[in-house]
């Protein structure tokens, strides 16, 4: 991308605003090196990435990027053996914490169902160095000092230092409080010179205290003396301080070596958080300028809906719809100067540059933009004083360069094409230049005030006229772009509003050809038609938005209704299942009683006992089952029944075997130890195939129930989860399952570790592994059973 294009389209000013939203020098460095890309896939990915960060901001308000600094030079110094200072080590620890915190932040959102595939990939590259981080913070305090607890030796040395300092101060303070002190001392204070404790002694009493003179006042009347009685104590103190310094250096070297070992990982983490800072800066900037994600196409057309210039206050600027590349490849904006034509031109250019840089652009949703390999712009008066070039010559030098390089993958922006020379020749040149660029397939937006170019838009298939609306009543441009309507000067209307007499204006009209007057009148009618059409469109758009709002409200109500309905159905189902479970338990109790009767050698159970047992079985079934109508389609009459056939007795939900037919509609059926008469309408023939696949059903205490092939533990407390795993594995073994899956999610990893620790000890487990990509990855453990 040409540097001149970036400059005239004020790309660097956008970058300056973007810089304000970075959280660290790492992100700022990324912004400073930002340039538009020309790779379609890269641009799409950058836009998607910015959109994910914008989603995070919408949901959370911010991202935890605090505490991150550029530690790359410090890490590289550690790598070559230089000792790092406490503050440098603390910066490394803080940055490691910041990267770890950012990783956890994104992963927590993903675990809660927020789809962030690109950001999730970014944070997956961050490697936690918690142990190193804690070693540093355990040794270095928040103020950058090495703390006493950094080592036992350092704690002992500092205890010695504090003891020595206390003894020295005590002796010196006794001296300053003595009866002669006021006479011999300049002041009753204890101070420090050359890291040794001293007292201020008057010049004439220097020999009283003995010791060493370390300093004197500016007047020479006061000497700062270390009295002889504390010289040994001060010496001991200095020795302890030397030991302290040596121990601190040892600790810092040890920590520096730890950093050097993990240097490559630390630098990799820094690169990831630098990218994250950069990504979120783009998202915050999008929020600031009310920008949206454009649809990026490779079809060489753009559709900017309600586009605004990002550097102009959104409350002031008038948004415009700008389309280019489908029905027409060139827009020629005509009309007088100071009408906002240049702003429109720059809006197109800066939106393209921003989109190709991965920035969201200030447009409405569903706007589309394409990728250009080159963007050329000839905007403004950039004549060169050094080269003694006129305005026209300066523009022409730039245009010649554009004509040499422009092709079908280029966007070309011309401001006041052909200006600065004779109007007739300038207009002719402008037409010729536009033809040349259009023939090369480039997309072109050009502004001009030459009336000759109004006809140009009608004489070329791929060219359309446009103008910026002017309000004659207020004598000011509205900055509203009118596609399909050429501009007009409005000179007569403006002059009339300013007080010029009608006579002079009428005479002026006579100097203009009839054809020109007709064209001006036609343009005025086009403007009026455009306004009416736009007003109708705005009304239709308002109705559409109102309909969408109503539709969303109805959808919300339907969803709420369905949720309430489902909740009630689930509740009713749960209650029904509880009743059925209670009935099954009651039935098991009855069967157990009958078995006990049989064990008591009462082989012939009396009729009244059977009747009583049968009625109790029927009474144990809940009302839900009793009232259920038998489905005639599945009943036995469709199958020719024979003695020995296996059937299901629908009333009890139990299997039985046909003994003999006792009437046209009844059979004698053996159900366990019971023998009873059952109507054919209450039976269902069981067709047992020769080879049957193993069903996911286990039988426990005469009870059939379904065992799932997977166990979902997400959201469970650790203790409850372990209890469920134990029961589930037992049930799965009873069901003869060869393989099952346990879903524990990714999260912090505690539940996953707990599950796998348990599996290692379980006798029924053959092997286990993480799930493959299609099975749930690290969030699932697949278990092979013996």
Swiss-Prot record:
Keyword Methyltransferase tagged: no
Domain Smr: 711-786
One GO BP annotation of this record: rescue of stalled ribosome
A UniProt-annotated Pfam family: MSSS
EC number: 3.1.-.-, 3.6.4.-
Matching InterPro entries: DNA_mismatch_repair_MutS_C (IPR000432), DNA_mismatch_repair_MutS_core (IPR007696), DNA_mismatch_repair_MutS_sf (IPR036187), MSSS (IPR046893), MutS (IPR045076), MutS2 (IPR005747), P-loop_NTPase (IPR027417), Smr_dom (IPR002625)
Binding site for ATP: 335-342
Alphabetized UniProt keyword annotations: ATP-binding, DNA-binding, Endonuclease, Hydrolase, Nuclease, Nucleotide-binding, RNA-binding, rRNA-binding
GO MF terms, alphabetically ordered: ATP binding; ATP hydrolysis activity; ATP-dependent DNA damage sensor activity; endonuclease activity; mismatched DNA binding; ribosomal large subunit binding; rRNA binding
Oligomeric and partner information: Homodimer. Binds to stalled ribosomes, contacting rRNA.
Role of this protein: Endonuclease that is involved in the suppression of homologous recombination and thus may have a key role in the control of bacterial genetic diversity.
Family per record: Belongs to the DNA mismatch repair MutS family. MutS2 subfamily.
PANTHER family: OS10G0509000 PROTEIN (PTHR48466:SF2), OS10G0509000 PROTEIN-RELATED (PTHR48466)
Official protein name in the record: Endonuclease MutS2
Lineage, broadest ranks: Bacteria, Bacillati, Bacillota, Bacilli, Bacillales
Gene coding for it: mutS2
């Amino acid at each position: 991308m040409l540097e001149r294009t970036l400059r005239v389209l004020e790309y660097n000013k956008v970058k300056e605003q973007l810089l304000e939203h970075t959280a660290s020098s790492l992100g700022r460095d990324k912004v400073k090196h930002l340039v538009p890309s020309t790779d379609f896939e890269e641009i799409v990915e950058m836009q998607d990435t910015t959109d994910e960060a914008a989603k995070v901001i919408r949901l959370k308000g911010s991202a935890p990027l605090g505490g991150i600094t550029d530690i790359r030079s410090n890490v590289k110094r550690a790598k070559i053996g230089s000792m790092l200072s406490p503050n440098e080590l603390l910066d490394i620890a803080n940055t490691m914490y910041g990267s770890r915190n950012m990783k956890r932040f994104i992963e927590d959102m993903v675990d809660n169902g927020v789809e962030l595939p690109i950001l999730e990939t970014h944070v997956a590259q961050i490697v936690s160095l918690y142990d190193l981080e804690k070693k540093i913070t355990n040794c270095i305090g928040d103020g950058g000092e090495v703390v006493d607890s950094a080592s036992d030796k350092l704690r002992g040395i500092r205890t010695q230092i504090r003891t020595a300092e206390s003894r020295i101060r005590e002796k010196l303070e006794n001296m300053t409080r003595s009866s002669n002190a006021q006479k011999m001392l300049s002041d009753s204070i204890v101070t420090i010179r050359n890291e040794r404790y001293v007292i201020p002694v008057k010049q004439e009493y220097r020999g009283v205290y003995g010791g060493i003179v370390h300093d004197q006042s500016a007047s020479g009347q006061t000497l700062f003396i270390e009295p002889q009685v504390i010289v040994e104590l001060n010496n001991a103190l200095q020795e302890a301080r030397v030991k302290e310094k040596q121990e601190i250096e040892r600790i810092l070297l040890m920590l520096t070596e730890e950093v050097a070992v993990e240097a490559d990982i630390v630098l990799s983490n820094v690169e990831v958080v630098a990218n994250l800072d950069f990504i979120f800066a783009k998202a915050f900037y999008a929020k600031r300028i009310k920008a949206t994600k454009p649809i990026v196409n490779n079809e060489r057309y753009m559709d900017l809906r309600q586009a605004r210039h990002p550097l102009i206050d959104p409350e002031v600027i008038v948004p415009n719809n700008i389309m280019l590349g489908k029905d027409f490849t060139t827009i020629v904006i005509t009309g007088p100067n100071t009408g906002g034509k240049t702003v429109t031109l720059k809006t197109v250019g800066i939106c393209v540059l921003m989109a190709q840089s991965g920035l969201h652009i200030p447009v409405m949703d569903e706007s589309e933009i394409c990728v250009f390999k080159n963007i050329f712009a000839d905007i403004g008066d950039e004549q060169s004083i050094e080269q003694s070039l006129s305005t026209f010559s300066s523009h022409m030098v730039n245009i010649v360069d554009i004509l040499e390089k422009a092709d079908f993958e280029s966007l070309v922006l011309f401001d006041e094409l052909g200006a600065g020379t004779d109007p007739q020749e300038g207009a002719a040149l402008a037409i010729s230049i536009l033809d040349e660029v259009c023939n090369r397939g480039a997309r072109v937006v050009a502004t001009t005030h030459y009336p000759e170019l109004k006809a140009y838009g009608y004489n070329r298939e791929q060219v359309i006229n446009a103008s910026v609306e002017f309000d004659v009543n207020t004598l000011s441009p509205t900055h509203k772009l009118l596609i399909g309507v050429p501009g007009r000067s409005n000179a007569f209307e403006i002059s009339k509003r300013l007080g010029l007499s009608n006579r002079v204006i009428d005479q002026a009209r006579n100097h203009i050809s009839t054809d020109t007057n007709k064209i001006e009148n036609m343009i005025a009618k086009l403007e009026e038609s455009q306004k009416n059409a736009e007003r109708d469109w705005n009304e239709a758009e308002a109705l559409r938005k109102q309909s969408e709002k109503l539709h969303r409200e109805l959808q919300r109500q339907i969803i709420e209704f369905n949720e309430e309905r489902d909740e009630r159905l689930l509740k009713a189902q749960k209650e029904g299942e509880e009743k059925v479970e209670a009935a099954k338990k009651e039935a098991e109790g009855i069967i157990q009683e009958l078995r006990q009767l049989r064990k008591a050698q009462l082989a012939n159970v009396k009729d009244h006992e059977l009747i009583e047992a049968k009625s109790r079985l029927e009474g144990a079934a809940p009302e839900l089952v009793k009232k259920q109508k038998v489905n005639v389609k599945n009943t036995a009459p469709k199958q020719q029944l024979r003695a020995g056939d296996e059937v299901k007795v629908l009333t009890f939900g139990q299997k039985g075997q046909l003994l003999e037919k006792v009437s046209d509609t009844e059979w004698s059926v053996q159900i366990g130890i019971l023998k009873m008469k059952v109507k054919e309408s209450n039976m269902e023939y069981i067709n047992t195939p020769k080879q049957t696949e193993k069903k996911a059903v286990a039988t426990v205490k005469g009870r059939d129930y379904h065992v799932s092939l997977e166990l979902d533990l997400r959201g469970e407390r650790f203790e409850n989860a372990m209890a469920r795993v134990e029961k589930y594995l037992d049930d799965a073994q009873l069901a003869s399952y060869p393989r099952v899956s346990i879903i524990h999610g990714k999260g912090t990893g505690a539940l996953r570790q707990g599950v796998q620790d348990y599996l290692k000890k379980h006798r029924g487990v053959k092997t286990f592994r993480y799930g493959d990509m299609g099975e749930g990855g690290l969030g699932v453990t697949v278990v092979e059973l013996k």
